[in-house]
Regions:
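Heptad-repeat amphipathic alpha-helical coiled-coil interaction surface used
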Residues: 87, 94, 98-101, 108, ...
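Basic helix-turn-helix/winged-helix DNA-binding cores
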Residues: 1-68
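Amphipathic alpha-helical dimerization/coiled-coil segments
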Residues: 56-111
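Charged, long alpha-helical assembly modules
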Residues: 160-189
Length: 189
């Protein structure tokens, strides 16, 4: 769980361990006991009814992503704190992203050697791995950019001026993405 679904679908451990029991209760999974040394573990497997339910669920649209991140909330309200506090939060964000990047590198090297812990779904794992790696890189890049911007601000952050070049760059990137998408859809002008 720590290296797979938990990275994008975080839930309390108690909830994660409770859910398979619910699937068994609804006939969507089967539970078998297995001895590991002195301990007994439960192995869950999907039933034919569970496969049908999963296939039906996969045809439905999913909910859009939700971003819930306390450090980003602190960046949002930073004018009520100190510049030093904001810089510290940005550094924590960058360090978090760099640590995840390092984990991603280890996962990717292991994957090249063994196809990972679930070789039967290696192709799907590459899609997920690329997304997570790109996301962590984007966060680290953003945190570095934001740090550079904040370092140029006065200590009284209420007097900071917005980086209009950054806004122009966002507008230009959006226009370029839209043009590329339209060109791909309709061909060159």
């Amino acid at each position: 769980m720590e290296r797979t679904i938990r990275r994008f679908w975080p839930r309390a451990r108690s909830k994660v361990y409770e859910e398979p029991k619910n699937l068994v209760a609804h006939g969507l999974a089967r539970a078998t006991k297995d001895a590991v040394g002195r301990r007994t573990r439960t192995i869950y497997s999907i039933t034919p009814e569970g496969r049908r339910a999963l296939a039906a669920w996969l045809t439905t649209p999913g909910e859009p992503p939700v971003l819930e991140w306390e450090q980003l909330v602190k960046v949002f309200f930073a004018e009520h704190g100190t510049r030093a506090d904001l810089l510290a939060h940005l550094e924590q964000i960058r360090q978090w992203a760099d640590a995840r990047d390092a984990e991603d590198a280890v996962f990717n090297l292991e994957f090249l050697q063994t196809r990972g812990p679930f070789p039967q779904r290696a192709a799907q794992n590459v899609l997920f791995g690329r997304f997570m790696s790109d996301w962590h890189t984007m966060i680290a890049t953003w945190a570095q950019w934001a740090t550079t911007v904040v370092l140029a601000w006065p200590d009284d952050m209420s007097r900071a001026e917005p980086d209009l070049d950054a806004v122009r760059s966002l507008v230009e990137r959006r226009i370029a993405r839209t043009a590329t998408r339209l060109e791909g859809k309709y061909g060159p002008p």
